[in-house]
């Protein structure tokens, strides 16, 4: 039951970046699995994941990682660290994570599965928003970024050049300026990890060191064919891993 006489500031909502709300419990990620506690309205959380933590299907997920990353355990550990950071509402990696490789290598399957698991904590942004070729007003799209912990852009056009200014704004801890349609402009502190999965590496300004240090390329070199190629595999992983 709501009480119109009680008001809170929007900045009080989802204010604790380490709290992760799941269907079964709210987790304080500083304490790991031991940080589980009952849901509380006093946490002012507005988002929730699609699933709760558990070990069911763990081996299926590990086998999938081994296939996609060709048994490169160092790479697997790094990618899992990135996914863990994406569950926290704080920018730890001021970079654009580029998942790169030819088709049929599992990159879209992997990131779509992670996005599905994170539920309302995850969002999408058009890949062309990150390029110099984007001529539209991107502030309404920026407005949808607020509060997301994982932000995914998919499939950049071949030969597209990154917009240094936009990438720097989305890959930093500085305030992001946005504007919903027919609403007043506002700013917010970003809390997301930004991932671009693509078959084509974007072009980058050769003279701007600031943009180069914000790019991390994760190779997806596997070729998944035959029996290992399952339609809608991201959904299968979501349901079973």
Annotate each PLM feature.
Residues 1-16:
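Accessory, often N-terminal, substrate/partner-engagement and coupling regions
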Residues 12-15, 19-146, 216-219:
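P-loop NTPase catalytic core of nucleic-acid-dependent motor ATPases
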Residues 15-18, 22-24, 190-205:
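Catalytic nucleotidyl-transfer cores of nucleotide-processing enzymes
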Residues 26, 157-158, 199-204, 221-225:
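Conserved nucleotide-binding/hydrolysis micro-motifs of P-loop NTPases
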Residues 125-138, 165-185, 228-237:
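Substrate-gripping "pore-loop 1 plus following alpha2 helix"
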Residues 140-147, 179-198:
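AAA+/SF3 P-loop NTPase mechanochemical coupling elements
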Residues 147-173, 186, 204-211:
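Conserved AAA+/SF3 P-loop NTPase catalytic/coupling segment centered on the Walker-B
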Residues 188-191, 207-241:
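Phosphate-sensing "switch" segment of ASCE/P-loop ATPases
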